[in-house]
Amino acid sequence: QPVADPLEPTANAEKYIVYTCIGDGDFDNGVLVDKNSYRTTLPTGVVCSFKVTAVNKGGESFPSEILSAGHAFQPKGTVLVINGFDRISAPADFVASAPADTLLAGFLDDVDHGVPYIKDISYIGKMKEFRRTIPWMDDDASGFGDSYGNYETQVIAGNTFDYPAIHGAAILQAGYSFVSCSDETVEEGSVSMNDYAYADLILGKECQTKMGRGGVKPLKFKTFSQPMQQAITAYCQQGGNLFVSGSYVGTDLWNNRLTQPNKADQKFATEVLKYQWRVNLAAAEGRVKSVASPFGKPNGDYSFHNELNADCYVVEAPDAIEPASPDACTFMRYSENNLSAGVAYRGTYKTCVLGFPFETLRTAEERNRLMEAILTFFDYGEQK
């Protein structure tokens, strides 16, 4: 849908350009369309991705997020993939409590590195001098704000807004078709989860985050907004199958350092999705193992991106979450400490929640293996 710019009334969209990417190829040069809908035919068995720009006499807008779809050969069903990872932010920061507020402050990358837009080429390393009173003495001793330089030559991956394609590739591999949408369309009601037997909510590193210095505008990027909670609750009540993954699925509702927890949010997590928060910063090594449970037999080990790199955003603070119902179980644990990394629930509906983002798994083989296990659980109640 077009969005009006209140600061510039002439910036209205007149036409749109739809760009298409087939499989692992690049985007084409786009198709100019006159209205905000476009119909095309998809090849079978391959992920097709789309992005849209708006155009008028003044030029072309920035592109939209990238949404994808895929039609499987003899599909077992269709999965709705919801892209709920919109966050862009600076790292976590702190200012010491008074009277030390004039003495200590800085960024805490290990707590939350933040999320760059697409990629970051300016980051050089973690901050290491937090004392405000330390002056610049030399370029090698630059005082307050001084940082390590071990990432000076490296590109750091951020939010690329294209994760439905990664999830979709694993869904196709498991024999299911998929479509995708933004979380806003679900919240507004223009897309109904109830039309699909399976849903996959991508939360990435979504969590409530301040804008700028904070205190002027409300926090943004909440994992489960009130409209999303309502949509998910209705979907589960009708017997749906929901997969959710993200770094802060528990912390954002129980222990976000920027806001007080809301009991209604926690009730939604425990009574609808059937998990509860245990701890943030649950693991440092980025390794997960499947364990024996009613979910099914163990199907191997997994690893996710736990260090800064150019290929995928970093997961520095995964969540440990635990079952909140007798009918729920832990089916994955962090290898280094056995904290619960994934919870599955089987009742009148089924849920599967991970405390780390699915798309950050390092290899396609790992993603394919885990997605097949989850969809098999949804279909049969356990892995076969």
List where the protein language model places each region.
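A glycine-rich, often tryptophan-bearing local segment used as a flexible ligand/cofactor-contacting loop or short
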Residues: 206-313, 328, 370
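Helical hinge/lid and interdomain linker segments adjacent to catalytic or ligand-binding clefts
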Residues: 120-260
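Acidic carboxylate-rich catalytic motifs and surrounding loops in phosphoryl-/glycosyl-chemistry enzymes
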Residues: 179-188, 246-249, 279-286, 332-335, ...
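Hydrophobic/tyrosine-rich beta-strand signature of extracellular beta-sandwich/beta-rich modules
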Residues: 48-52
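Conserved aromatic anchor
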Residues: 1-11
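Recognizes extended acidic, P/S/T-rich segments that occur
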Residues: 9-45
